[in-house]
UniProtKB/Swiss-Prot annotation:
PROSITE patterns per UniProt: PPM_2 (PS51746)
Cofactor names: Mg(2+); Mn(2+)
Binding site for Mn(2+) 1: 90-91
Name of protein: Protein phosphatase PTC7 homolog fig
Domain PPM-type phosphatase: 58-314
GO biological process, one term: dephosphorylation
Keywords: Hydrolase, Magnesium, Manganese, Metal-binding, Protein phosphatase
Native source organism of the sequence: Drosophila pseudoobscura pseudoobscura
Stored PANTHER family: PROTEIN PHOSPHATASE 2C, PROTEIN PHOSPHATASE PTC7 HOMOLOG
Pfam short name (any one): PP2C_2
Family to which the UniProt record says this protein belongs: Belongs to the PP2C family.
Keyword Hydrolase attributed: yes
Amino acid sequence: MAFMRSKPSLGSLARVAFRWCGPGVGLVNYSQEPYLVKAVQGKSKPRSPTLQSAMQPRAQAETIQAPKCFGEDSFFFSSTPKADVMGVADGVGGWRDRGIDAGRFSRDLMQRCFVHAQKPTFDGRNPRQLLSECYGEMKRKWKPILGSSTACVVAFNRSESALYTANLGDSGYVVIRNGSVLDRSEEQTHFFNMPFQLTVPPPDSNREMWFCDDPSEAVATRLLLQPDDLVLVATDGLFDNMPEQMLLEMLSKVQGVHEQKAIQEAVNRVVERAGALSINPIYKSPFCLRALENNVAYGGGGKPDDITVVLASVAMRQCNTVGDSNESKGSDLRPRLSFP
């Protein structure tokens, strides 16, 4: 089956010109390499009705790469010569009833993902393995951090111009091309409002009491990207409150825009809107509609929750390399591959 592209692939743009530099020097390729222009925004949910005014957004500039958090959500993004990596994690709030900081687990998970993504050997091709290694480290700690978290990590491999994804639970990603959804993650739940989650339970407890899902259960995909594509990674606080069409409309003005300021302003607007909808008592939110579909009593309105959104635009930049280069080996692969 053939797939038509509306634009040339990034791989086909990789080598645009070269010149001879004399004996012993070889060819200098004047090429364009793909990269992601990123911005992040988030809001912590009000912990009581009187704290709604505390839902103030805090923008994070692209230069800030170390993990940050919004309430019990956490995120990171990383850029190396091989890959741009972005991730979000949503700490499971039920641990608060046991006197445990529900956000500490997600923060530790994203911190470890950030450290691994910064390694020179990590090329972004296996974010599911990255999750597995980090989760394994957390379980092996002498005094492990107890808790649970969903996780979504996406990595853009520059040499292939391909986005590799790993999603466990109800956080997720959306890829937008020409104003339409090209690909979107599917949430994983045991039942309504009970997502798959990575868990470190108390050592003296019965493991069967907990939902202890494994990183191997994360859905992994590969998707070829083109210039101007948008990649959004977010926790369920966004998806539970903002329908897909509204999201597309809000991001339509930055399709093809590569200025970091514009990307930041766009993600600010998305989070601000989602936050307002989450505390609207008469709004028919996606969460409310799914509750009705599952015969779950819900009073209606939005779903107050922490909201974290990372938005990126695929751009090109000039780079000079010495030596003969080959076009992307992945340029003739299917646009989307799922790994079992």
